[in-house]
Amino acid sequence: MSETSQTIPELVSWAREREFSLSLNTERLSYLLAIALYNNERFDGEMQESDLVDIFRHVSKEFDQSDNITTRANNAINDLVKQRFINRFSSEFTDGLSIYRLTPLGVGVSDYYIRQREFSALRLSVQLAIVADEIQRASESAEEAVRRGEDEYYWRRNVFAPLKYSVAEIFDSIDLSQRIMDENQQSIKEEIAELLTKDWQAAIASCERLLDETSGNLRELQDTLNAAGDKLQAQLLRIQDCVMGRNELYFIDQLIVDLQSKLDRIISWGQQAIDLWIGYDRHVHKFIRTAIDMDKNRVFSQRLRQSIHHYFDAPWFLWTAQAERLVDLRDEELTLRDEDALGELPEALEYEQLSDLHDQIVEAMQALLINHREHNQPIDLSLVLKQQLDNYPLSRHFDVARVIVDQAVRLGMASADLSGVYSQWHEINDYGAEVQANVIDEYK
């Protein structure tokens, strides 16, 4: 534990002495946020009691509570003062009127709900650029201190202080923003679930938009993190090399370890969030496909019959491959006994099972990949996938890609994975599918 941190008993004693007791219901939280927004528009950061009463009146109007405004406003103000969200000041210079200012606690709570909600790739890039500059200056100062034999005061001011009070705080801000994005993803999942529960047919387009937007945002943020992560780690290692073996600078070495852990956690969060979201994306699409398969003989046929009935009011076009099956729409309860109406499976596919198809793909891919191994040729999965997927229909792309990746990782591994180098995303078909994999160049 670094010397600037506090122990658990110290923090417990500090909180106990000040008798902290926080309780914010929806109305009180809304009132605090409204105060924070109003305070941001004032140059002096000070508010009078009449201002707080007017703000409370607007909040109460939104909650449809317009009675006893003054009394309830005074109670709310006293409650926020008691919980130390705002401070009250009064003196002879204010003619007996009290002035109010937000406390650090009030600023922190309101800032979390207002400004921290915006987390974009642009903001992340700016934060990482600031961090890179601070670490660069700190590393140069550390190397200069080693050459000139500077004392501990120099190390604290030019190396420790920027890392502790600038870099670490920005890392904490990014970490907090990522946790907020976790909440946003959960709210999007709830929104998708609600859409699918109410009317999944009308919700398919909205679900696709939400899924694509979230996937794109996560991938863009992760690309930004990957681009800066290695450079930041390298700069931290430069500083760590400068303090290695110097026991009097233990506090800097401990801080470097903490920063490296935070940076690793920030970068790994992005990839983990993408993996989890991809799994959820597949789950939603599987649900939609299942719902369509189960529903096609009920709601779909009913909607089509309604469209036919109202054709002259709303004309439409219908393309069909087997027009004779339209007779099935005459009666929803019709028992289909005619074998011709159901159609027959082509003889070439009649006895083809999924396992047989899988075995065929495995044999073909093994023959392809073993050839690379025998000639000690590196396997570029993105290139192999793109070449092979061109030979298969879209419906089999997922199975083929899964088999290729599975067989490739059994043959060898990528040396770039051991050095922590992230590969770029490469397209593997004409439908937007991408893969991120280093070249396999070491065989087992």
Swiss-Prot record:
Location in or out of the cell: Cytoplasm, Nucleoid
Keywords: Calcium, Cell cycle, Cell division, Chromosome partition, Cytoplasm, DNA condensation
Example GO molecular function: calcium ion binding
GO CC, alphabetical: cytoplasm; nucleoid
Keyword Calcium: yes
Domain of life where this protein originates: Bacteria
Entry's Gene Ontology BP terms: cell division; chromosome condensation; chromosome segregation; DNA replication
Region Leucine-zipper, residue ranges: 211-239
UniProt keyword Cytoplasm present: yes
The family this protein is said to belong to: Belongs to the MukF family.
Role of this protein: Involved in chromosome condensation, segregation and cell cycle progression. May participate in facilitating chromosome segregation by condensation DNA from both sides of a centrally located replisome during cell division. Not required for mini-F plasmid partitioning. Probably acts via its interaction with MukB and MukE. Overexpression results in anucleate cells. It has a calcium binding activity.
Protein name, UniProt field: Chromosome partition protein MukF
